Amino acid sequence: MNLMNKFLLFFPKYLIKLFLIINFIGIPSISFAENEMGVSTFMYHRFGEDRYPTTSVTKEQFQSHIKYIIENNIDVISLEEIISKLENDEKFNEKSIAFSVDDAYLSFFEYAWPIFKKYKIPVTLFVSTDIIDSNTAGYMSWSQIKQFIDEGGSIGQHTSTHLHMPLNSKKYVKEDLLNSHKSFMKNIGFVPKLFAYPYGETSLAIIELLKELNINHAFGQHSGVISSHENHYYLPRFSLNENFGTSDRFEFAVNSFPLQIDQFSPEDM
């Protein structure tokens, strides 16, 4: 049996199974976001750290990503521009992408940041403050973070201890966030407005806490394209590592379009 015949034989069966699974577990009702191109936002952690393939892209992969957007004249915007459009209820009529990096690993500062800077590509670094305060090897220092800001980089909050937010009490999480605010004020003189959930995890209670602390937008780690219909407290990002940082996957994500979630059940975890 050739490949096409196998596909025709087995695909309908898998389609039926997928339909049954979706109806059973309550996957959200989805439609295309009308007349919007959207923003594909990417998330990196490490660069060229082969010991950590689940959180690192190879240098060759990163170079291929940059080469693709330069050669194809892809519009790259900052996370602040995304937030501005969301706050003003503007549609994303032009196809764009955006870049972010979590955790402030030294490989970002030493390898990736010079490349972002060379091509004037905006990028936001989400920082968990405790690991920086402790001068841990393999992470950036506050001096390097300040240099990154001075050279045009953008900073975001990522909690103090990189905790699993929904698994802890509201009181504990609030204390953690306030500790990170104190560290930011001490070391860079301001508290960043942008926020990203460690591990991409949140809950309705956590979102309410962010609102109490005047954090108005937050990014997760789930794949998807941002549109004007997006939940401001659960903005999607395409996560990139060795397995999911191939040229094919990156180019597919760059050229993806937004889907509008009309109904989501259950509402909380």
Label each region the model flagged.
Residues L15-I27:
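Bacterial N-terminal signal peptides
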Residues M37, F42-Y52, N93-I97, Y105-A205, ...:
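Metal-dependent polysaccharide deacetylase catalytic core of the NodB/CE4 family, i.e.
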Residues L213-H222:
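Catalytic-core region of carbohydrate-active enzymes that cleave or remodel glycosidic bonds
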Residues E80-E87, V127-T129, A196-E201, H222-V225:
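Short, solvent-exposed turn/loop segments enriched in Gly/Ser/Thr/Pro and often Arg
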Residues S29-I97, F244-M269:
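N-terminal pre-catalytic segment of deacetylase/amide-hydrolase enzymes
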Residues M1-F11:
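N-terminal secretory signal peptides that target proteins for export/translocation
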